[in-house]
């Protein structure tokens, strides 16, 4: 504070009065009485120095209003502020070493120095607090994740797709923080593009040369941000298409059990199917019919432009079961696999009845139908395992051919047409030849009706009918 001329006394007295009212006089005033008396005795060297006021006189002086333009002194300023200011931050006119010798100059000069020194310091402090804030604001990292930054870049592009360089260019131009630290965050953008399902890679067109693929947003991930705000995502986006296909495949394999799609792949080539075959035909050749139909449907989805399957064009395949296993199947599942066999036996009986006489044909047909049920222990495996029955079935045609030429053929047919179980009974009961004939025909008929394939059923039936007619014609003559 600067003191001058005539108004300095009122200023000094006003300052002293305000300070004395606020500070406890009993505590502060005891040590200052002696100092004030000493200062008054010494006097001030300056001719225009203001007169000193004692504390008892200061109580009677009313406070003076400050001049216009001067700041009002603070109420918390203690009584010894001029000396403290002189000691703490003395200005150019303050003498710190001798405060008692030159109290007026030291006090006034210290106050001037403190005021002059405090002004620029306060200004520089306030200016220093505001000046560094501007560059800091420009370098603040944006509160957006890398996924949000990539989404912003893709959505603002005209074609809604950008390359990696285009995304980095948009982020650098939009945010100065990333512009100054450009090479450090480019790999982070690349990793987020590759590892998140919400971004889809699009290869370049043939007529669009350049480096790098395009990236766009998955159509189902448009609502992954709340209300269009890029500050927060609702949840992590995942594609459910592949999981849905895997669930369908697993369900299909469980429904078919052992006849799964893996049965077709087990016998296929290294690429999952035999060479030169359609997937549907390959699956139908090695798997269950139900699994083949499922494999055909799956192949139609996987190979939409492949050739049509070959399986419907070809005739049904012949069962590759040997005769012994087929006999076991017939014995175990007679009621389920028997309709075709029963139809063939019925047709064989009808042919035999048409070739013979009326009575013999009726007896033969009735015995042919009743013989399998009357003998439940009969099976094809027993006849084939007996030994002579296997070549006997093949020798029927030779016997019949010889019987048409002469009597030697008749004896051959008589010896081979008798089954092993009825040889002794036929020798002992020579008078009952129709019964032995019927038993012979009933015994041979199942052998001829169960060939290795279904292609020889009709020739076997005609051969059996011819053998029965030849035997009936030859045996009454003997």
UniProtKB/Swiss-Prot annotation:
GO terms for biological process: anatomical structure morphogenesis; cell differentiation; in utero embryonic development; negative regulation of transcription by RNA polymerase II; positive regulation of transcription by RNA polymerase II; regulation of transcription by RNA polymerase II. It comes from Homo sapiens. InterPro entries: FH_FOXD3, Fork_head_dom, FOX_domain-containing, TF_fork_head_CS_1, TF_fork_head_CS_2, WH-like_DNA-bd_sf, WH_DNA-bd_sf. This is Forkhead box protein D3. The gene is FOXD3. Residues 104-128 have a biased composition (Gly residues). Gene3D superfamilies: Winged helix-like DNA-binding domain superfamily/Winged helix DNA-binding domain. It holds the Pfam family Forkhead. The keyword Iron-sulfur does not apply. Residues 1-136 are annotated as: Disordered. SMART domains: FH (SM00339). GO terms for cellular component: chromatin; nucleoplasm.
């Amino acid at each position: 504070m600067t003191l001058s001329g005539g108004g300095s006394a009122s200023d000094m007295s006003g300052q002293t009065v305000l300070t004395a009212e606020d500070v406890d006089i009993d505590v502060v005033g005891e040590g200052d009485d002696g100092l004030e008396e000493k200062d008054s005795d010494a006097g001030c060297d300056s001719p225009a120095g203001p007169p000193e006021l004692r504390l008892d006189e200061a109580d009677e002086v009313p406070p003076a209003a400050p001049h216009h333009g001067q700041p009002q002194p603070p109420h918390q300023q203690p009584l010894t502020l001029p000396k403290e200011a002189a000691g703490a931050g003395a200005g150019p006119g303050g003498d710190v070493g001798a405060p008692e010798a030159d109290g007026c100059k030291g006090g006034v000069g210290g106050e001037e120095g403190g005021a002059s020194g405090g002004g620029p310091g306060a200004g520089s402090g306030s200016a220093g607090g505001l000046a560094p804030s501007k560059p800091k604001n420009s370098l603040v990292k944006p509160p957006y994740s890398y996924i949000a930054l990539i989404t912003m870049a893709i959505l603002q592009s005209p074609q809604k797709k950008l390359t990696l360089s285009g995304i980095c260019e948009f982020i650098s131009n939009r945010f100065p923080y990333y512009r100054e630290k450009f090479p450090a965050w480019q790999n982070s953008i690349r990793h987020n593009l590759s590892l998140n399902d919400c971004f889809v890679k699009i290869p370049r067109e043939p007529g669009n040369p350049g480096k790098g693929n395009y990236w766009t947003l998955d159509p189902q991930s448009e609502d992954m941000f709340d209300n269009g705000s890029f500050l927060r995502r609702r949840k992590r986006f995942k594609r459910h298409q592949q999981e849905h296909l895997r669930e369908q495949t697993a369900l299909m394999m469980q429904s078919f059990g052992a006849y799964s799609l893996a049965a077709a792949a087990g016998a296929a080539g290294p690429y999952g199917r035999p060479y030169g075959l359609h997937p549907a035909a390959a699956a139908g050749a090695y798997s269950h019919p139900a699994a083949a139909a499922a494999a055909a449907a799956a192949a139609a989805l996987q190979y939409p432009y492949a050739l049509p399957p070959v399986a419907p064009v070809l005739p049904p395949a012949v069962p590759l079961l040997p005769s012994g296993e087929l006999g076991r199947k017939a014995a175990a599942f007679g009621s389920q696999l028997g309709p075709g066999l029963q139809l063939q036996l019925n047709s064989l009986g009808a042919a035999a009845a048409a070739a013979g006489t009326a009575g013999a044909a009726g007896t033969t047909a009735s015995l042919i139908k009743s013989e399998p049920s009357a003998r439940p222990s009969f099976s094809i495996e027993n006849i084939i395992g007996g030994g002579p029955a296997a070549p006997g079935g093949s020798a029927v045609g030779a016997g019949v051919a010889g019987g048409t030429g002469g009597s030697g053929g008749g004896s051959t047919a008589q010896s081979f047409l008798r089954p092993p179980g009825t040889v002794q009974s036929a020798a002992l009961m020579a008078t009952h030849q129709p019964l032995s004939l019927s038993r012979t025909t009933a015994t041979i008929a199942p052998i001829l009706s169960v060939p290795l394939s279904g292609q020889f059923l009709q020739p076997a039936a005609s051969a059996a009918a011819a053998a029965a007619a030849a035997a009936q014609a030859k045996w009454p003559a003997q």
